[in-house]
C-alpha cells in the first residue's frame, strides 16, 4: 500500500521539478554563500506541494486515465486505494509543503507554490484539459513556477531575472509537451482530450514546436546580454540550442511523426537539465 501512495505522487515529475528548483536556487545564490538548510527546506516544501498537486490530478483524472492505454494501470484506475484516503493524503501533503515554505523559506516562495498549485489542479486539470487546446499553455505557467520558487527562496523578491527565468521555462514546457502530444496522439484522441495536436493537427504542432524552441533559445541568450550570466553560458547553451532548433526544424518536413517527436522529447530533457546546470555553475566561469 505504501508503494501505491508513493506512485500517485508521480515521483518522476517531482524529480524533474527538483531540477528546476535547484537550478533557480543555485542561480540566485551565485553572488551569495550557499545556504544548505534553506535549500533543503525549499526542495522539501516545494516537492510536497507538487506531490499534492499530482495526487489531486490523479483523483480528478480517474475517468480519463481508464480510457488511455498509457494510464489505465495507474493506482486509482485499478482502484487499489480508497478515494477518500487519497483525498486526505493530498491535503496533508499540500498543507505540510506550504507550511514549510511559509514558515521556513519565505512568503513569496509559498505564494508561488499556491499559484502553481491553483493553475495545475484547478485551471488545468479541472477545467482547460477537458475543454481547450490552450490547456498546455495554461499548464505551462504551473510548470514554470518551480524555477522561480527556487530563485525567490534565495532572493526573496521577484525581479526581472526571475521573470525572464519564468518565461524561458514556459517556452521549454510548450515544446516539450507538444512533442508528447504527438507521441501520444492516439491516447488523447481516444480519451477525447483536445490537445493541440488533436485539434489543430500534427503538421501545425511541429511548426509550433520549432517556434517555441527558437523563443527558448532567444530568451536564454538575454541572460548574457542583460548581464546576469557570462558569455561562456551563451556559447555553451547556444551550441545545444542550435542543435535542438535543427532537430525541431527538420521534424517539420519528416513523416515519421512519433519517432521524431520522441527524439525531440528526449532531447528537450537534455536541454533543460543542461540549462539548469549552466545557470548553476556560471559563477565559476
Curated annotation (Swiss-Prot):
Topology versus the membrane: Multi-pass membrane protein
Family matches, as NCBIfam families: cyoE_ctaB, PRK04375.1-1
Function: Converts heme B (protoheme IX) to heme O by substitution of the vinyl group on carbon 2 of heme B porphyrin ring with a hydroxyethyl farnesyl side group.
GN (gene name): cyoE
Disulfide bonds: none
GO-annotated molecular function: protoheme IX farnesyltransferase activity
GO annotation (BP), single: heme O biosynthetic process
Reaction(s) this enzyme catalyzes, per UniProt: heme b + (2E,6E)-farnesyl diphosphate + H2O = Fe(II)-heme o + diphosphate
Protein name (database record): Protoheme IX farnesyltransferase
Other remarks on this protein: Carbon 2 of the heme B porphyrin ring is defined according to the Fischer nomenclature.
Major subcellular site: membrane
Compartment list: Cell membrane
Signal peptide: none
Biological or metabolic pathway of the protein: Porphyrin-containing compound metabolism; heme O biosynthesis; heme O from protoheme: step 1/1
Its EC number(s): 2.5.1.141
Family: Belongs to the UbiA prenyltransferase family. Protoheme IX farnesyltransferase subfamily.
Pfam families linked to this entry: UbiA
Organism: Buchnera aphidicola subsp. Acyrthosiphon pisum (strain APS) (Acyrthosiphon pisum symbiotic bacterium)
UniProt keywords, alphabetically: Cell membrane, Heme biosynthesis, Membrane, Transferase, Transmembrane, Transmembrane helix
A GO cellular component entry from the record: plasma membrane
Domain of life: Bacteria
Transmembrane segments: 8-28, 36-56, 80-100, 107-127, 133-153, 163-183, 209-229, 232-252, 265-285
KW Transcription regulation (keyword) present: no
